[in-house]
């Protein structure tokens, strides 16, 4: 009998403690932000919408190496390589399906030219799913993005039609390795 009364007192005490806790939270600062009215805090390394950048000369950085599409775990990136008259590669089309993208950043890490960069933009809501498929024209921005001075063709030393090896900027003359042998 006393055990039964003890359980009732214990249960009532638990309920009263819960009610007091809920009531006290009514007067505290709210943790939930009302999004459109209050701005959202984004961490410095937040990964949002993907963009394609340009090099300092104004040319698009993407060389259509297809590493981003291979690194993408969900396969939302597709592109087709084309070549200019001087031998540079560029994407004939570059397509990202943002309805499948998980914003993991693996495409940004895989890109050797830093053409793909993730921005803190997260407002991409659309009424139709096909509007979330972005083409190259939608992704290409006018600026260099996070690396303003980087130019892949200056650093890589790739041969360009009409230029001998060793004549590009930041490229040393080729060394004849056989002359170094004893």
UniProtKB/Swiss-Prot annotation:
One Pfam family in the UniProt entry: Fer4_7
Residues involved in [4Fe-4S] cluster 2 binding: 72, 101, 104, 107
Cofactor: [4Fe-4S] cluster
Binding, [4Fe-4S] cluster 1: 62, 65, 68, 111
Keyword Cell membrane applies: yes
Entry superkingdom: Bacteria
Function of the protein: NDH-1 shuttles electrons from NADH, via FMN and iron-sulfur (Fe-S) centers, to quinones in the respiratory chain. The immediate electron acceptor for the enzyme in this species is believed to be ubiquinone. Couples the redox reaction to proton translocation (for every two electrons transferred, four hydrogen ions are translocated across the cytoplasmic membrane), and thus conserves the redox energy in a proton gradient.
Protein name: NADH-quinone oxidoreductase subunit I
Protein source organism: Pseudomonas putida (strain ATCC 47054 / DSM 6125 / CFBP 8728 / NCIMB 11950 / KT2440)
Gene name of the encoded protein: nuoI
């Amino acid at each position: 009998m006393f055990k039964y009364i003890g359980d009732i007192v214990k249960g009532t005490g638990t309920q009263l403690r819960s009610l007091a806790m809920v009531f006290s939270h009514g007067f505290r600062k709210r943790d939930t932000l009302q999004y459109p009215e209050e701005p959202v805090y984004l961490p410095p390394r937040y990964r949002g919408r993907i963009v394609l950048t340009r090099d300092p000369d104004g040319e698009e950085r993407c060389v259509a190496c297809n590493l981003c599409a291979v690194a993408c775990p969900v396969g939302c990136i597709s592109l087709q390589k084309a070549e200019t008259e001087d031998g540079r590669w560029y994407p004939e089309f570059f397509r990202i399906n943002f309805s499948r993208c998980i914003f993991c950043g693996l495409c940004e890490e895989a890109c050797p030219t830093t053409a793909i960069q993730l921005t803190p933009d997260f407002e991409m809501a659309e009424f139709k799913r096909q509007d979330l498929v972005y083409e190259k024209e939608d992704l290409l921005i006018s600026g260099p993005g996070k690396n303003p001075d980087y130019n892949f063709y200056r650093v890589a030393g790739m041969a360009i039609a009409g230029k001998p090896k060793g004549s590009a900027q930041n490229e040393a003359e080729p060394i004849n390795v056989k002359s170094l042998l004893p």
